[in-house]
């Protein structure tokens, strides 16, 4: 049982009974052994009265379903690698403010600075998720760590006012999605404080599962900032080998004894823990609208290349010919989603170029490495999935030589995300590469200009390094 914090609110005996009664009796997916969840409940800013209710509900849900065991804490030492590694998932429970920054009391017994300690804690959380840990966010977890850009992208967005605290309509965006199966209808109504989000929130990066129903909700409220009517309520994503689930419901205490929402949160937690399989490709990727075929097994009219260097083989794949060289799109692209499949031969060394200059691709463009490095532990900045010489992949998602891989490259301004076989392996802001020949971690790179200064518009292309490689189902969706 987790301790109940009176200072943040109190879970009364009556509320405890309501929470217990609302919990699902079993897991969505049975597990051989309960997972271990760390429930992080430190708030630096506004203290939600529902913090102990979220912790209590998470613990009781694990007990009733047998799917996990929960431990609540506000001790920042628990986020250190040696402690966090004891858990399978991390629940960010209605936190607010810069909780990743150590307080004076956290520095007792330490000889380093707050800045150095925070750097260790940041790296620990990111590495935990990239290595396969689950991240679960309740409500105001998005009202946290505004000074830590990578956290904003990891959790999916930042809070930008709550225009509604009343009954509102909810749209279940994908009723047939595995996480949506708990809902009996495509729309329902609920009362809670409802957030709107700002950057880095984007459907280019997230699979949005629930949104505000603007047709049945009062849209004349103050503080409505979004003009696109995209008011997300819940989403999922991947990060390396890890998974992220966020649900914005949970300001009001009674959310944690709403049976339908608790079933949904159970499934979201099991998804984040890796026990429930669900497609997390971003909503903009799976939305078929706006795509243009660059190669679909037929003609190569969209491309320019040396005659005989590339051709369509008998299986309808784009294949490398003798002395092929580079192959480039005729059009240049700035912001886009590039979706393709590739197959590498043994010892293959190729690459997917974007925002590149065909006349100087090595220094005038970006490359995602295509290489036969499947199974390699701790891949580096020259292995499959690397942003070549600039950023190692978060995880090795490459399939063995001879098998088809699916790669999605998403570029929007300075943000570059690469998804390989369903796993986000690059999630970078190239504005952080502000020094020529140097990466943000202090390591060297080949570039004579800072990556942030490279052109934001250029051609798409594939590289020939003399070993067989095949591409198919290549399409692009221009973005604003």
Describe each model-derived feature in a short phrase.
Residues 37, 84-145, 241:
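Short alpha-beta junction capping motif
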Residues 14-22, 157-240:
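Catalytic beta-strand/loop cores that center a nucleophilic Ser/Cys/Thr
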Residues 43-46, 76-78, 95-99, 135, ...:
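Solvent-exposed loop/turn segments at secondary-structure junctions
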Residues 44-56:
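Glycine- and acidic-residue-enriched helix-capping/strand-helix junction motifs
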Residues 66-80:
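A short, well-structured beta->alpha microelement
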Residues 151-153, 157-166, 170-172, 188-189, ...:
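Carbohydrate-interacting regions of secretory-pathway proteins
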Residues 2-32, 52, 63-65, 74, ...:
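Extracellular ligand-binding/catalytic regions of CAZymes and related secreted enzymes
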